[in-house]
A protein has these predicted regions:
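RNase H-like polynucleotidyl transferase catalytic core
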Residues: 14-20, 90-106
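Anionic group-transfer/hydrolysis microenvironments
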Residues: 35, 75, 115
Length: 159
């Protein structure tokens, strides 16, 4: 990822190097908790139902606690019955957001912070990108998460 904007003093030209080439896509599957912790998985390429199912089974469910609420948007794999059954067996409640409602999704705020970090990191290889993603995810704090949940209209009881 490259930065989209920059600043310089008046009368100077902004110069930055951005490679030109054909890139493969990288997908980050992640969750966020009020304490700022995440359960993330990074893959090269796009995701589908089988990849999302593996994420839920091996990464997300082990990080969940009974009585947790999992909020998901309307991406097709989020609605597959076997994924919903796995989450129900884990003892969590599943909420689906209305269509086209990123304003209600706190993880969208997290992606904004992650993307800003990744643009600044200027990773130019898969390994460098994976390391940068790990560092970016570790920058998420409990204060960030609480602010994002509050901004999206969620009310919660602090323990």
């Amino acid at each position: 990822m490259t930065r989209l904007y920059g600043r310089v003093f008046g009368g100077q030209r902004l110069v930055d190097a951005a490679p030109h080439g054909h890139w493969c896509s990288t997908t980050i599957l992640s969750s966020i908790r009020l304490d700022g912790s995440t359960a993330a998985m990074v893959i090269e390429g796009a995701t589908d139902a089988s990849v999302f199912q593996a994420y839920v089974h091996h990464i997300l469910i082990p990080s969940l606690r009974p009585q947790d609420i999992v909020v998901m948007d309307n991406l097709a794999p989020h609605k597959y019955p076997n994924i919903l059954q796995m989450l129900e067996r884990a003892g969590v409640e599943v909420w689906h957001l209305p269509p086209y409602s990123p304003d209600f999704n706190p993880i969208e705020k997290m992606w904004s912070k992650i993307k800003t970090y990744l643009r600044k990191a200027k990773a130019r290889s898969s390994n460098a990108l994976f390391r940068a993603i790990g560092r970016a995810l570790r920058t998420i704090t409990a204060a960030d998460a609480a602010g994002w949940f509050q901004h999206c209209g969620y009310r919660y009881i602090q323990s």
